[in-house]
UniProtKB/Swiss-Prot annotation:
Family note: Belongs to the polysaccharide monooxygenase AA9 family.
Glycosylated residues (UniProt): N157
Keywords, in A-Z order: Carbohydrate metabolism, Cellulose degradation, Copper, Disulfide bond, Glycoprotein, Metal-binding, Monooxygenase, Oxidoreductase, Polysaccharide degradation, Secreted, Signal
Region named Disordered: 249-315, 328-401
Reactions listed under catalytic activity: [(1->4)-beta-D-glucosyl]n+m + reduced acceptor + O2 = 4-dehydro-beta-D-glucosyl-[(1->4)-beta-D-glucosyl]n-1 + [(1->4)-beta-D-glucosyl]m + acceptor + H2O
Protein name, entry field: AA9 family lytic polysaccharide monooxygenase H
Protein encoded by which gene: LPMO9H
Summary of the function given for this chain in its UniProt record: Lytic polysaccharide monooxygenase (LPMO) that depolymerizes crystalline and amorphous polysaccharides via the oxidation of scissile alpha- or beta-(1-4)-glycosidic bonds, yielding C1 or C4 oxidation products. Catalysis by LPMOs requires the reduction of the active-site copper from Cu(II) to Cu(I) by a reducing agent and H(2)O(2) or O(2) as a cosubstrate.
Co-factor remark: Binds 1 copper ion per subunit.
Binding-site positions, O2: H183, Q192
Record flagged with keyword Transferase: no
Gene induction: Expression is significantly induced by pectin. Expression is also moderately induced by cellulose. The degenerate binding motif 5'-SYGGRG-3' that binds to creA involved in carbon catabolite repression is present in the promoter.
GO biological process: cellulose catabolic process
Record EC number: 1.14.99.56
Amino acid sequence: MSVARTAGFALASAAIVAGHGYVTGIVADGTYYGGYLVNQYPYSNDPPAVVGWAEDATDLGFVDGSGYTSGDIICHKDATNAQASATVAAGGTVELQWTEWPESHHGPVIDYIASCNGDCTTVDKTTLEWVKISESGLVDGSSAPGTWASDNLISNNNSWTVTIPSSLAAGGYVLRHEIIALHSAGNENGAQNYPQCVNLEVTGGGSASPSGTVGTELYTPTDPGILVNIYTSLDSYTIPGPALWDGASSSGGNSGSGSASSSAAATSTPTTPSVSVPVIPTASSGASSTPLVPTPSAPAVTPSVPAGNQAPQPTYTSTYIETETLPGQTVTSTTTEYASEPTQPAVETQVAQPSETEAATSTSTVTETASATAAPTGSSGSSSGSGSSSTELPTDSSSLSDYFSSLSAEEFLNLLKETLKWLVTDKVHARSLH
């Protein structure tokens, strides 16, 4: 493979990260606890004991309607008990921190809790009875596909806060937190469930010990909130699952409700700006041979770990291809995840579907982003990538190819190292806990 082509693949892989997500950690009553890092821990011989349930969704995939009667719907694919618990007082809050959630994956955010009736590290997940304590669905359906709870989660720095009911009896519980993506839900088994579970030790509280619903009976593939076309204007939306427990503290952790309503919070914009990086899509099975031209992406927001509570540095890299069919259009994206320390998350960029005009000019992919990548530098925090050590790249694709071909192996490796350092190490967003 030529140096130019190798460079193209390397830059594309570094710029695109996994399209779905998972909970990296939680903050319970102000204390941070690490979650299960599915992009690293499955490949470790001795993963740490964390509050998040272990699972095997290493492709960052989902559970669809065909899995609603299997154990996978409970806490995700092949989930096993967490070996630690987070302490939270009844009436307290739990903030769940996600990796960047894709904007196209609109849908409700739902929280359940189930008593372990003993040791949560050994409880049989199929016996857990889930009680819904929080739900948020369609916020504004006046313009398809609408504004959803998932959009509020994104605007809140990819996090969601749920209140533990104050009347709940003290003891060991499993919190089941879930996003249901509805972008393909117009077809049966098209909805995508992303359940995440964490162990809690609830203190104080009252005497309430409500009975619930076992995980394999929460949903059916034809439930009104599961089989739904979000690409038509919706006046209302029925959040799937059992009814909200009357002892729950609220109807939604980050605002929004089961029916459509206007909400200023729904249109709030994250304060952390995105970083432009070159995106050079590669040909894949089922995808058009015409390269996709990247369009300006939404602000990227990434979770962080408070100082002094850092999880081990992940080292695993995974790549997968996803093809999704929307009404009248097909979108194929190639995604690669680069894991790093929770305090230094990889820069994430989403490749949007090109318009007809963009497709006509798709051969100038690198040109459109060259000004943002005019060579990565070692200066931290610079969004332009300029500096005394920068090397200006050519501004047209043919010249760029010639430029890469002219590099020696050592020069190319140095350029690649600088690019990856700029993408992964220097471009860091931090978030303070409040």
